[in-house]
Amino acid sequence: MTPTVFLSILCLGVALAAPAPDYNLDAEWEEWKRSNDRTYSPEEEKQRRAVWEGNVKWIKQHIMENGLWMNNFTIEMNEFGDMTGEEMKMLTESSSYPLRNGKHIQKRNPKIPPTLDWRKEGYVTPVRRQGSCGACWAFSVTACIEGQLFKKTGKLIPLSVQNLMDCSVSYGTKGCDGGRPYDAFQYVKNNGGLEAEATYPYEAKAKHCRYRPERSVVKVNRFFVVPRNEEALLQALVTHGPIAVAIDGSHASFHSYRGGIYHEPKCRKDTLDHGLLLVGYGYEGHESENRKYWLLKNSHGERWGENGYMKLPRGQNNYCGIASYAMYPAL
């Protein structure tokens, strides 16, 4: 595995002069700024416009060259359109996810349905938005615990990502600069609790720890790492509920994802940099057509992907590392 540790924030100022804008894109640029609530200083607008135009051209070229109509996979210009590649990586590529051997509680011969969506069973809270803070690891872990809390109590309570960010630093996490789900689960287990979003709301920046035990709404007794193969992941998902996973999310095609079954030829299974929640699986078309997918909840808001979710190839040799770093808690 190639480790990816911590990246420095890219300064907004760029030394090189921005190229002259393509005035044919003026109306599209103004509409994009309006719909994404962007305002800039005059100098910054030149730089951001240049980046945005480059991304527009890349998306058009990528669609033309790669035939993204396959499996209905599409990309689009979204809220990340004025960000450089390095800036987009800041949202994901903040910590390496070391591969771990796993073991999990497994029922004998669990019945595997042809499709599964834990959202329909009430296990999944609404999609949230991490913003410019690289806290995907915390969103993935809290969402996973939320599902187990619902399974145990029947109550679906959004948990505090901010609590996890602020208070798990001594376990190796870095707030908005990244963290590992294993360390986050370890904190919640040892801490004896985690607050709800309602009492410890998300602020998209790390602060000092303000956890109060009397406001805790959940405890984690232990947690399990799933063996690194898709069959074990499938069994764990069916048996236990939503699973915290990590994938290679470093590519522009990921940040520009709109819908369909994701396809990225450069996606790796041993370089993991983005945490998500695995909530189900299914297939497009007929089951015999081998267009199977995993269904994942992201933390980029509902305007990204399929209302905040994405489909990743299933049964394709651990595509993008979907089964390389999966875990879930027991309450």
Curated annotation (Swiss-Prot):
Involved in trophoblast cell proliferation and differentiation probably by affecting mitotic cell cycle progression. Proteolytic activity and nuclear localization are essential for its role in cell cycle progression. Its EC number is 3.4.22.-. SMART domains: Inhibitor_I29 (SM00848), Pept_C1 (SM00645). This is Cathepsin 7. InterPro entries: Papain-like_cys_pep_sf (IPR038765), Pept_cys_AS (IPR000169), Pept_his_AS (IPR025660), Peptidase_C1A (IPR013128), Peptidase_C1A_C (IPR000668), Peptidase_C1A_papain-like (IPR039417), Prot_inhib_I29 (IPR013201). GO terms for molecular function: cysteine-type peptidase activity; peptidase activity. CDD domains: Peptidase_C1A. Residues 18-111 form a propeptide. Keywords: Cell cycle, Cell division, Cytoplasm, Disulfide bond, Endosome, Glycoprotein, Golgi apparatus, Hydrolase, Lysosome, Mitosis, Nucleus, Protease, Secreted, Signal, Thiol protease, Zymogen. Glycans are attached at N72. Disulfide bonds join C133-C176, C167-C209, C267-C320. The keyword Cell cycle applies. Belongs to the peptidase C1 family. Residues 1-17 form the signal peptide. Expressed in placenta. Expressed in parietal and spiral artery-associated trophoblast giant cells, most abundantly during the phase of trophoblast invasion. From 14.5 dpc onwards, expressed at lower levels in labyrinth trophoblast cells. Expressed in trophoblast stem cells. Expressed in heart, liver and testis. It comes from the Eukaryota. GO terms for cellular component: endosome; extracellular region; Golgi apparatus; lysosome; nucleus; perinuclear region of cytoplasm. A motif (Nuclear localization signal) lies at residues 33-50. It comes from Mus musculus. It is found in: Endosome; Lysosome; Cytoplasm, Perinuclear region; Golgi apparatus. The active site is at C136, H274, N298. The keyword Transferase does not apply. GO terms for biological process: cell division; mitotic cell cycle; negative regulation of mitotic cell cycle; proteolysis; trophoblast giant cell differentiation. The gene is Cts7.
